[in-house]
């Protein structure tokens, strides 16, 4: 099973990715993890990437594709792989295609923007323990305080509504075009293209898991 999960921040991709990697026995491949591992191992591509990053530059798509190819030769990828946060842009998707890197499915998890804003801006955390709550879906026993210690809960900067809206804008401008890219490729060249599936990310974790499993069997 070789696939990409697409969807806006807060759509639940992380939860579903964890289910898929366990279910299919495949690794979740993140470009960030890959870069860090290559730099640490001192591979030729890792050293090249380190040079660029140390100079404050952005690692080129060609370099990323090289790292992806290296990563996919490792034994844990024998049954497949799940790309996490990659590709992010059309040039990266084109580079992936040109490199002949195989994909079986591209799955989009669709959640209305208003739901995402409610999901993310409602999160509250207890900094010392990491316990998390949600003002609507998983509220603390007493408003605004941790169940165990009674200490105040905080809203992380990442979860503030204006930050969430900004991240959604970035997604719409940068990554959303990938949805059109893969869906139109699947329509125009079904034999060569990965199968494109769209599922709703609204509902319980188990409901979404069930939709995802069905999508990957069709």
UniProtKB/Swiss-Prot annotation:
Q: Where are the transmembrane segments?
A: none
Instruction: Report the record's Gene Ontology biological process terms.
Output: AMP salvage
Amino-acid positions noted as binding AMP in the UniProt annotation, renumbered to this chain: 31, 36, 57-59, 85-88, 92, 156, 167
Identify the metabolic or biological route this protein is part of: Purine metabolism; AMP biosynthesis via salvage pathway; AMP from ADP: step 1/1
Q: Where in the cell is it found?
A: Cytoplasm
Its Gene Ontology cellular component terms are: cytoplasm
Q: What Pfam families does the record tag this protein with?
A: ADK (PF00406), ADK_lid (PF05191)
Q: What class of enzyme is it?
A: transferase
Major subcellular site: cytoplasm
Establish whether keyword Protein biosynthesis is in the entry.
no
Molecular functions per Gene Ontology: adenylate kinase activity; ATP binding
Q: InterPro entries recorded for this chain? A: Adenyl_kin_sub, Adenylat/UMP-CMP_kin, Adenylat_kinase_CS, Adenylate_kinase_lid-dom, P-loop_NTPase
The organism's place on the tree of life at top rank: Bacteria
Record-stated family: Belongs to the adenylate kinase family.
Q: What is known of its domains?
A: Consists of three domains, a large central CORE domain and two small peripheral domains, NMPbind and LID, which undergo movements during catalysis. The LID domain closes over the site of phosphoryl transfer upon ATP binding. Assembling and dissambling the active center during each catalytic cycle provides an effective means to prevent ATP hydrolysis.
Give a short account of what the protein does: Catalyzes the reversible transfer of the terminal phosphate group between ATP and AMP. Plays an important role in cellular energy homeostasis and in adenine nucleotide metabolism.
Stated name of the protein: Adenylate kinase
What's the source species for this entry? Bordetella pertussis (strain ATCC 9797 / DSM 5571 / CCUG 30873 / LMG 14455 / NCTC 10739 / 18323)
């Amino acid at each position: 099973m070789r696939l990409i999960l697409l969807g806006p921040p807060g759509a639940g991709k992380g939860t579903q990715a964890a289910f898929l990697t366990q279910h299919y026995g495949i690794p979740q491949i993140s470009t960030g993890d890959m870069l860090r591992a290559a730099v640490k191992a001192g591979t030729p591509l890792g050293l090249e990437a380190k040079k660029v990053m140390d100079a404050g530059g952005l690692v080129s798509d060609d370099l990323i594709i090289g790292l992806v190819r290296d990563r996919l030769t490792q034994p844990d990828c024998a049954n497949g792989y799940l790309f996490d946060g990659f590709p992010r842009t059309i040039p990266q998707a084109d580079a992936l295609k040109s490199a002949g890197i195989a994909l079986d499915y591209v799955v989009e998890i669709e959640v209305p923007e208003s739901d995402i804003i409610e999901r993310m801006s409602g999160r509250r955390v207890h900094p010392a323990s990491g316990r998390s709550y949600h003002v609507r879906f998983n509220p603390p026993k007493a408003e605004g305080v941790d169940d165990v210690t009674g200490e105040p809960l905080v809203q992380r900067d990442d979860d503030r509504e204006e930050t969430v809206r900004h991240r959604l804008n970035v997604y719409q401008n940068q990554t959303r075009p990938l949805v059109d890219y893969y869906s139109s490729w699947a329509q125009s060249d079904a034999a060569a293209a990965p199968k494109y599936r769209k599922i709703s990310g609204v509902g319980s974790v188990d409901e979404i898991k069930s939709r995802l499993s069905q999508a990957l069997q069709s």
